[in-house]
Every structure is written in structure tokens, then in C-alpha cells.
Amino acid sequence: YPHGSAQPQKVRDGSVILMDCGCAVHGYESDISRSWVFGEPSPKQRKVWNTVKRGQEIALETAKIDVPVGSIDDAVRKYYEKEGWGPGYRLPGLSHRTGHGIGLDGHEPPYLVHGDATPLQAGMCFSDEPGLYIPGEFGIRLEDCWFMTASGPKLFTPLAKSLENPI
């Protein structure tokens, strides 16, 4: 957790599939993750997926010009803790930052992580990936890239619609 297993896995009914990939165009990187269930999702899988989706939305709602980028991570963690996850970076919960800068490198500063005081400015690009991970069970991560404008964040890709339609 949070980036899969080093051992081969057999996909079975109820298995969570977590895809994390990206591409490079003219030297600029991208990063995207989607999670879905092979077969019928359990109520717990559905609840976690919906919680992560809301976490992604909270990150975007918090993104405003001059706001410290670390406050985006703080807002997502506050919501997750209210939902019973964590606290902080503890598992089960969100063990990594909410997102990272993206551009000429796939992971670059500034980071959407507690304590990063970098003020959010127009033109900055980030990933938004507030996953939730339950060791020994499953993890859900939804990740999309966005850029900051004077009027707020704008997505490069549409957010996942639902657990049944994550693309």
C-alpha cells in the first residue's frame, strides 16, 4: 500500500483494481489513477470509493489563489478523520500526500502535504489523489491533474463519475 503488490495477484469477483498511469506530451508529464471493483462491489468498497471521490472534490473546493498548498491536504484529512480514517497519515487512511506538483517531472514541488506553505498561484499544475487504504483488504485512489487559474482550479481530465463508471 498504496502502490500495489510486488507479488502476482489473481483478479477475483470483488477484487479492487487500481490503475495508476500517465503519459508525456512535449516533455510534460501527466498522472491519473482510477479504482473499480471486478464484479459486484461490497457496501464497504462502495462507501470507501464515495469517500475518496468526496475527498477529491474537497481538495478542488479548497484550492484558491494565495492559499497555502498544504491547507488542501489539511482539508481532505479533516474530512477523512470525520469519517473515521487516520488520524493524520495513519492507516487505515491516507498514508501519502493529497497531491503533488506536476509538469516536467511526474512528481515535483510544491506538494499538497501538511506544512507546505507555498501559496497557490495561477499557472501551477497538480495531481489530486487523496486515496484511502485498508491494509490486508483494499485501497481506493482516484487521481486527476488540474491547473490553477485566477478564477479557481480547472481539470485537465473529467473526474470519475461513479464506481461503476470510473473512466
Q: What function would you assign to each model-found segment?
A:
Residues 1-167:
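Active-site neighborhoods and metal-handling regions in enzymes and metal-associated proteins
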